[in-house]
Amino acid sequence: MDKIFEQLDGLLDRYEELQELMSDPEVISDTKRYLALSKEEGGMRDVVAAYKKYKQVLSDIKESEEVLRESKDDDMEALAKEDLEDLQKQKADLEDQIKVLMLPKDPNDDKNIIMEIRGAAGGDEASLFAGDLLNMYMHYAERQGWKTEIIDATPTEVGGYKEVVVMITGDNVYSKLKYENGAHRVQRVPVTESAGRVHTSTATVGVMPEYDEVDLKIDPKDIRTDVYRSSGAGGQHVNKTSSAVRMTHIPSGIVVSMQDERSQQENRARAMQILRSRVYDYYETQNQEKYDQNRKNAIGTGDRSERIRTYNYPQNRVTDHRIGLTLNKLDRIMNGELDEIIDALIVHDQAQKMESLNV
């Protein structure tokens, strides 16, 4: 904990400095600066509170140890021992809490997300499972008090999706759903299977933080926009006007097509929304090869052997292969009860980060 204490003392000094700055009338009148300082202060608040409590516990431990050394009263000594035992437990708990709070923060954790779900290996059954995953995430979002909106979809004749893109907005969406990146495998008897045999299919999930113009400004000269006639929903209207939009970010080669909205203006806005997130994702890697690999890891090739989680319907079982977690409540999970899986993934991620920091 010594290295952490060095950081904590500096953090405490900075926190107190921020408190002073935020009460300065000159700073208060500068909205942009005040908001920036407020955000910094908010990011420190929990760890500073835990550290102050920790310092108080250390002081109480020292006091109890002095009582034990100097006491000649058996009752007083017994009481001090009891207090000391309780304080040592508090100290250990606070050390664990502080370690977690001091882990590097993902700057995207508080962002909304754009989620892409694709039916992959398994034909019609894979497209149906893509629809099931969409429903699962939408139910989970509802439980979290988040909002969902389907912004692009390619439905299949059997009622599933070849691809569907959904935007999920709310508090800390990315922090919880970023672990859903990868290939999801389903084992079940398809509705079209007369012999009752279990088939294996795959759907892939990609999760990107939603970025806005503050995060990334794209030069309009770097975007080529093509318009064409939509073949999607919207009745005869779509055949009379070129409302569909295809945007290409020339430096990266990233392409986004959008035709689900009724007007070209709406399709442009939606396409730009997705394009900005993909381009930011690209520049985060600063390397086309890394970008391609990340997209492959996120969206997946759809191969049956590539998976992060398996959903076994006959046995009502879900297994997350990354952490070896198996839960026999598939029916509840598909209804949006994902908390147990996501919480376990967060704990696993934190443990790995702690190990890498050797704290």
Curated annotation (Swiss-Prot):
Cross-referenced SUPFAM superfamilies: Release factor
GO molecular function: translation release factor activity, codon specific
Cell compartment(s), UniProt: Cytoplasm
Name of one Pfam family that matches: RF-1
SMART domains, per database record: PCRF
Cystine crosslinks: none
Modified residues (N5-methylglutamine): Q236
UniProt main location, coarse: cytoplasm
Protein name listed in UniProt: Peptide chain release factor 1
Source organism of the structure: Lacticaseibacillus paracasei (strain ATCC 334 / BCRC 17002 / CCUG 31169 / CIP 107868 / KCTC 3260 / NRRL B-441)
